[in-house]
Regions:
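Acidic, glycine-rich two-metal-ion catalytic cores of nucleic acid-processing enzymes
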Residues: 172, 176-266
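N-terminal leader/targeting and assembly helices and adjacent pre-domain segments
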Residues: 1-175, 260-266
Length: 266
């Protein structure tokens, strides 16, 4: 079991490093956008409150009459578009690095293409392949997430107007929505990284002449029932791999090596 564990750990280490680097940058993007957007929302909401006559509660209709509200909408759209663009650029770059890194990590000592590598163009094509049953690409999910965030932020603004909440309460509500959106983005990163890890490993094994692979699930307390049932199950190298089996899945695939071969982790 030694080499299987070593193989899985090698892949997991590289994937974990890629995820941490990506998350660090994502947090910066989200923090900057959140600070700018919330400040704009607070100014707009406070302006609405200041325009109300003594004792009169504002309504959504009052909000829509403000030029500041429509300026806010344009600014919000601009900020979220920049956030989405930055995410798309970051993820594209990190996913390509992940694919190349995993592909180049493993090799069989006696394979003819021991030091073969994969180029960026091929890696880019591989990471852009649609693999989920809903037919959506990872890039389209970025924009779905930003659209949801935009709607949620505006819904919370209207909610504050209707319920008469304070500006400080609005800020808390908006921060919560940004946290939800970040968690969706983080889940996307982790799930796609796992898929790319599987893709790259499968292609490397195939190029090395491996005929069969085995699913290897982490054996810690976080291993779920689904992954536990897949552990050590074997699949033909040209088949569809069952992992990642769910969002944030940590399973890997390792080659079924013939007795005369030893696995090399570069």
């Amino acid at each position: 079991m030694y080499w299987q564990d070593r193989m899985a750990q090698s892949q997991a280490k590289l994937t974990s490093k890629s995820i941490k680097e990506t998350e660090k940058q994502l947090i910066k993007y989200y923090s900057k956008t959140m600070e700018t957007v919330i400040a704009d929302f607070e100014l707009t909401y406070q302006k609405l409150l200041n325009t109300m006559e003594q004792g009169r509660e504002p309504t959504p209709a009052d909000l829509y009459k403000l030029d500041k509200y429509w300026q806010l909408q344009a600014q919000l759209k601009s900020e979220l578009t920049k956030l989405g663009d930055k995410q798309a650029e970051l993820l594209s770059r990190k996913f390509v690095e992940q694919y190349i890194g995993i592909y180049n990590t493993m090799a069989l000592p006696d394979e003819l293409n021991l030091f073969s590598t994969v180029d960026k163009k091929t890696a880019q094509q591989m990471i852009n392949q649609i693999w989920c049953a809903d037919g959506k690409s990872w890039s389209s999910r970025i924009w779905t997430n930003t659209d949801k965030l935009q709607q949620a932020l505006n819904d919370n603004l209207i909610n504050c107007v209707v319920s008469g909440k304070k500006t400080t309460q609005l800020k808390d509500m908006l921060q919560s929505e940004f946290n939800v959106s970040y968690n969706r983005a983080d889940s996307l990163v982790r799930t796609e990284m796992a898929h790319i890890q599987t893709q790259a490993a499968q292609q490397r094994y195939k190029d090395s002449g491996i005929q069969e692979v085995e699913v290897w699930a982490d054996k810690d307390e976080r291993r779920c029932e689904v992954c536990g049932k897949l552990h050590e199950k074997r699949y033909p190298i040209n088949g569809v791999m069952p992992v990642p089996a769910h969002p944030r899945c940590r399973c890997t695939i390792i080659p079924v090596v013939q007795p005369n071969n030893q696995l090399m982790v570069i």
